[in-house]
Amino acid sequence: LNNKEIKLKTNNRLLNAKIVGESDVQLEMGKPVFEWNKIPLKEKLDHKNITLDIDGKEFTYGFSLNVGNPHIIFFVKDCFEYDLKILGPKIENHELFPDRTNVTFAQIDDENNITVNVWERGAGLTKACGTAACATAVAAFIKKLTKNDINIKFEEGSLNIKMDADLNIFMRGPVSEIKHTSLEI
């Protein structure tokens, strides 16, 4: 590809992408969705303050939203203190989430940096997840825990998430080649 900008079609939307610098790509991820029935949640409730009971332990102040797929984020002191191999599938499949949900435990490092531990819906524990980075950044910004330009650190690498005044989300991160393939058109 010699183009600096392309459109990427996902299963539910079209994303604008552009090459930035030597090895970064920026995606326009659109706006987050907060309406309870579009996240979706089973019932109408405050999506910014969800409490879940998992095996007798309460997880409070969960923030649920949709950024192309559903997410719930819990802000905690240490995101690796919780065993997502056990908690992840229980929260993902909780009755509150009719389409299941991605699960993120996030710790605020400072007003521009967050470290996360992510359970990806249908995939399990993951080393990185773009939509989880976007959802976490939006939730932290709305809760006034961070600014609107945030670095999200995963086990493997990091992504930069920016939001404009209308909450349009821009995700930027490095690209690495996993496999090279040719296709004749």
Predicted regions mapped to residue ranges:
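Helical hairpin unit composed of two closely spaced alpha helices linked by a short loop
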Residues: 131-133
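Active-site proximal loop and beta-alpha junction motif in alpha/beta enzyme cores
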Residues: 1-126, 138-185
